[in-house]
Amino acid sequence: MSKYIHPITVKAALEVASNLLPADYREVTEGHGADPFKYLLLEAAKAECVYFSSPGGRTAGMAGVEEDGRIWMLCTDVIKNHPTKFAREAKRYVDSREEKLLWNVVDKRNKVHLKLLKFLGFKFLREINFGPNQLPFIEFCRVRRSSRC
């Protein structure tokens, strides 16, 4: 796929969990009520997960798509060193997905992910109260265009 997108490893999942961006950490813990280490290690056991690396080889983030098309991504501060490269690699990953519908919710406070989702072509649907703390989240989706007429 790309020299910056790799099949997930336990090591990469632990690196991401240990170095989450503050907004991502807050989204996982406050928004979903989950422990980042447990969550990412469980996700790493799934074949559909990948991790992103920087040009220097550092772990920049981790992403996956659930069976129902629910897409997710969590990042480290490494993305700040190469924001354009990371955004392009994230787009490459999203564009490679064959699901007709990709969707999820994002913490309204997570400005980095809101900006990235817009760049990736996702549409924002509505604001909802979500999770154990009923925080404001935004539903988003992207419908794959058919190549057939």
Regions picked out by a protein language model, each given a short descriptive name:
Residues M1-A34:
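Short amphipathic alpha-helix that is part of the acyltransferase structural core
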Residues W72-R88:
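A short, internal acetyl-CoA/4′-phosphopantetheine-binding micro-motif in the GNAT/acyltransferase core
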